[in-house]
Amino acid sequence: MSQEKYIMAIDQGTTSSRAIIFNKKGEKVSSSQKEFTQIFPQAGWVEHNANEIWNSVQSVIAGAFIESGVKPNQIEAIGITNQRETTVVWDKNTGLPIYNAIVWQSRQTAPLAEQLKSQGYVEKFHEKTGLIIDAYFSATKVRWILDHVEGAQERAEKGELLFGTIDTWLVWKLTDGAAHVTDYSNAARTMLYNIKELKWDDEILEILNIPKAMLPEVRSNSEIYGKTAPFHFYGGEVPISGMAGDQQAALFGQLAFEPGMVKNTYGTGSFIIMNTGEEMQLSENNLLTTIGYGINGKVYYALEGSIFIAGSAIQWLRDGLRMVENSPESEKYALDSHNNDEVYVVPAFTGLGAPYWDQNARGSVFGLTRGTSKEDFIKATLQSIAYQVRDIIDTMQVDAKTAIQVLKVDGGAAMNNFLMQFQADILGIDIARAKNLETTALGAAFLAGLSVGYWKDLDELRTLNETGELFEPSMNESRKEQLYKGWKKAVKATQAFAEIDD
């Protein structure tokens, strides 16, 4: 009797690594998760130990096997999805990182980004990469490491150092250095990749003085990149055949294959992506133009709005302010709040993302009175996530010249019913929550399975992930607009405060 075959997805996130085993129906068979250390060397800096990330991935692969009883030789293929932009530079010969991984959230390279802006490169970078010049993307992070690690520039020029985002690092480790590759979706987030010409941009590399020899080969999102070295996969030699940055993987996992489809993942940050099809649309309103995915010889573009603080605002309530013991508790407190929504929290802890791109803004609270309770504060924090999503959806509709009818949602905070209902109310459109909230991992699994024939085609995938629950708007128009107007005032005041000179 032939053994049943499965697909494993490795989901390497900002705060934890996970391995999930899926069956042919797209159902989760088992999963394992491990958190790792967040390193904050200075205010606004965020780093990870890349070796610790690799160890956590090894650990969760084992955990998924142990929990399910599935053996390594039953895994047909592996899909990888990852926190994007986070930057690793390592020694080609020893495999050891020369510095910590600089995380997407980290602002330590903001002065470099400002310097590029002041040199007049904003338009050039936008046209080539689809991105706004910001410390968020990998380009300035690579430059920072080459500047701050002694001898790094020289070694990079000699071809002794390699650069990669987390996907590249994991494939390199899993294949024992046999494959130094990335995919379209991750390359598009480096600010070094020309998304129109689909190649590393020589002019940008020259401006930043980043040696091309460091860069990985860019491949499609669904093909075999290499096989696991048996000693790194518990004896199994398994093809790694699907790869996408976490948000693009979620777009694919949400089956948003048609132009105009939009998804939002409520994770650490919140990321809204619209599939715009095979045409690259440059945003005129500070959204990012990026690559959604490339499969079967075609590349599908996307518009994206990035919110830096979403689920992490709830973590802040839990860990920083100790107002809740766990994240789900925030829903109960929000429902117990009886104020008139006059409190606004602007969680600009690491600046404001799209459409403001204000890296100097910091968190603020408005509208407090003597009667404000803990419940009100928690509710306002949840509402801030929904308001930020509205900022982006409004902008996206202008850029894409289309009305969005429904927003597909997933991610941890999408489990919060209060937040989902308020999101529907403040947007005035339906919110469709995926039945399987593991859409990021599922997207990576789908991409891996397609390339080895585990699933036949997109039509077969369409039968695998249904909508779980629909939230319909119930707030009247004038109330909705009054609340949103208050939010816009709060953001304006937050930005003004950051601009006041000492």
Swiss-Prot record:
Record-annotated membrane-spanning stretches: none
Modified residues (Phosphohistidine): 232
The enzyme's E.C. designation: 2.7.1.30
Binding site for ATP: 14-16, 268, 311, 315, 412
Reaction(s) the record says it catalyses: glycerol + ATP = sn-glycerol 3-phosphate + ADP + H(+)
Gene3D superfamilies: 3.30.420.40
Pathway the protein contributes to: Polyol metabolism; glycerol degradation via glycerol kinase pathway; sn-glycerol 3-phosphate from glycerol: step 1/1
Residues binding glycerol, per UniProt: 84-85, 136, 246-247
Top-rank taxon: Bacteria
Keyword annotations: ATP-binding, Glycerol metabolism, Kinase, Nucleotide-binding, Phosphoprotein, Transferase
GO biological process: glycerol catabolic process; glycerol metabolic process; glycerol-3-phosphate metabolic process
Amino-acid positions noted as binding sn-glycerol 3-phosphate in the UniProt annotation, renumbered to this chain: 14, 84-85, 136, 246
InterPro entries in the record: ATPase_NBD, Carb_kinase_FGGY, Carb_kinase_FGGY_CS, FGGY_C, FGGY_N, Glycerol_kin
Function: Key enzyme in the regulation of glycerol uptake and metabolism. Catalyzes the phosphorylation of glycerol to yield sn-glycerol 3-phosphate.
Subunit structure: Homotetramer and homodimer (in equilibrium).
PANTHER family documented for this protein: GLYCEROL KINASE, SUGAR KINASE
Family: Belongs to the FGGY kinase family.
Protein name: Glycerol kinase
Name of encoding gene: glpK
